[in-house]
Swiss-Prot record:
This is UPF0261 protein BRA1168/BS1330_II1159. Belongs to the UPF0261 family. InterPro entries: Tobamovirus_resist_UPF0261 (IPR051353), UPF0261 (IPR008322), UPF0261_C (IPR056778), UPF0261_N (IPR044122). The lineage of its organism: Bacteria, Pseudomonadati, Pseudomonadota, Alphaproteobacteria, Hyphomicrobiales. PANTHER family: UPF0261 DOMAIN PROTEIN (AFU_ORTHOLOGUE AFUA_1G10120) (PTHR31862:SF1). It comes from Brucella suis biovar 1 (strain 1330). Pfam families: UPF0261, UPF0261_C.
Amino acid sequence: MTAHTNSPRILVIGTGDTKSDELLFMADVIERAGGSPVMIDVSILGNPPYEPAYSKHDVAEAAGTTVQAIIDSGDEHSAMALMAEGATALVRGLSQRGQVDGMIALGGSLGTDLALDIAAILPLGVPKFIVSTIAYSHLLPPERIAPDLMMILWAGGLYGLNPICRSVLSQACGAVVGAAKLVEKPSAEKPLIGMTSLGSSCLKYMRFLKPELEKRGYDVAIFHATGMGGRAYEAVAAQKGFVAVFDFCIQEVTNAESGSVVTSGPDRMENAERAGIPQIIAPGAVDMVDMPAWQNVPEQFRDRPYHAHNRLIASITVSPEQRRAVARVVAAKLERAAAPVAFILPTGGVQERDRNGEPLHEPEALGAFLDEMRGAVSGTITFEEVDAHINAPEFASRALAVFDRWVAEGIVVKGNVA
């Protein structure tokens, strides 16, 4: 794995007509840190007092329109949405040509709105920084935050440079250049397997599966399925970064169906199937919805069993009817897969806290999910039941047996055993 030895190309994105002093300062810091700033101007009304690498006219053209047409669109919201569309298309093209080593954007709410779109289309692993007056605030929908995005509060930054602003901007620019210089590109030495899970207090199969897969010559990346982790998993799947996946914690689908903010977006369980990646699926933690522990419990869940994991996140079981609905959603997603899918159903339970005597034990509700899943899965999907809990060795062994069979049949590429 190698890091950049030359000057990394860093996109510097902002409205040069209103923030020229700050953007020029950022470009200077990037150069002094050993990077090559590539200025992209997303102004609408005015012009920057410098020559950007890509002008607002280039951005508008990438959106299939003109700056004047954008001005005539009627209001600042629609105008910035069009500029976001153009900037995203422009940056996507640069990235596909290998001309982006990192990005940093500067903005208030309008600039942040635009920058979130750009960060979302850059591949996982490309350093992404946004310096924003609303960094990590409640204004940002979780599903719009790229999984490896870094944000820094633009403290005291409106209307020109000052000592606080210089400190913030210099830190951010130094960070993006340093990240671009030192980032290690993922190694292709061994095939990569993706796996989803929660922490070992809830799900434990990875303790058995990871070393067994590594013995077979694979690297294994395990994603913490609490919203952002699922988003990262989906991003790598969309890039065809896995040779196979063990998607054993699909709780984020339950979260999405229940309206929780702990979401990985509407495309959870969809990118591996689109990419033609073989999938082994299990319903880990599908019986509960995660909510912020510091918020009031929504009315619909007030009477449901509740477990606070810590001061940040709490789990609430969903009703039998909701579990049936989730089963139908999961089955519908799997039907669209372009590669083999195996669904393994552990009839003894789907997470550690649903065991007999534990706070989330609801055998009738679990039975509702199992029953609905049996009827919803079609014959195009390999369906296996295991008379065991998902955390039992029997479950992990069955999953590994399916994987080994797929390797023997050539469905999954063989591992690289040293």
